[in-house]
Amino acid sequence: LLALDTTPDEILAIAITHEHTDHINGLKTFLKNSDATLLASKDTLDALIKKECIPTKTKIITIDNKSIDICGIKINRFATSHDCEGSSGYTLTLPDNKKVAICTDLGVMTDTVRQAIMGSDLVLLESNHDIEMLKKGPYPPPLKVRILSDKGHLSNNICAAELKTLLQNGTKRFILGHLSQHNNTPLLAKSCATASLM
């Protein structure tokens, strides 16, 4: 927030993708000091309530199969394939009809995901790991299997394979997201993505 010169009071809503700690760390503290509305799937909200991450004062909106409008921004949820219930990606359609898609923490690109993000002007797409780095890296074998599974994370190769189709369907900009610190580098992710577009 400091880098954006933004205060918690200026945040009107927070959309949570799923319940894993790396995505909700600090949520409770933030919500205690904010009037932001919390958006998530029913399953994710249920998990957050069980983990006592949501202060009682927080306004909650379940966003499963409906569109939510916040200050003229239309927010839609789509299901992602990850190892928790209710894992989500989001599209945001701005008042000028430009569309942004946020899509991380998915082990596989499903038709549901493709349909949801197709035609977005900007897509933030997971490019989590280089497969060889992951296989040779320090993670224990069960974690490697989890990451490589259909409920894990997208590799650079899988991400790159999707970019050309997105580009052909109107996407103008990409952000490669959720890069692993241990199993990837920004240069590897970018090189793989760039090669797929040639």
Language-model segment annotations:
Residues L1, L27-F30, L48, V113, ...:
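Hydrophobic packing residues within well-ordered alpha-helices of enzyme cores
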Residues L1-A40:
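Active-site metal-binding motif and surrounding structural segment of the metallo-beta-lactamase
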Residues L1-T6, N25, I63-L122:
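Core dinuclear metal-dependent hydrolase active-site scaffold
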Residues T6, C53-I54, Q168:
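Helix N-cap/coil-helix junction residues
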Residues I11-E19, L39-K42, A101-T104, L124-E126, ...:
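Active-site neighborhood of phospho(di)ester-bond hydrolases with catalytic His/Asp-centered motifs
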Residues H20-I24, L45-A47, C84-E85, V108-D111, ...:
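Active-site environment of divalent metal-dependent phosphoester hydrolases
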Residues I24-G86:
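Glycine/small-residue-rich loop that forms an oxyanion/phosphate-binding "nest" at active or ligand-binding sites
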Residues D111-M198:
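Cap/insert and terminal regions of metallo-dependent hydrolase folds
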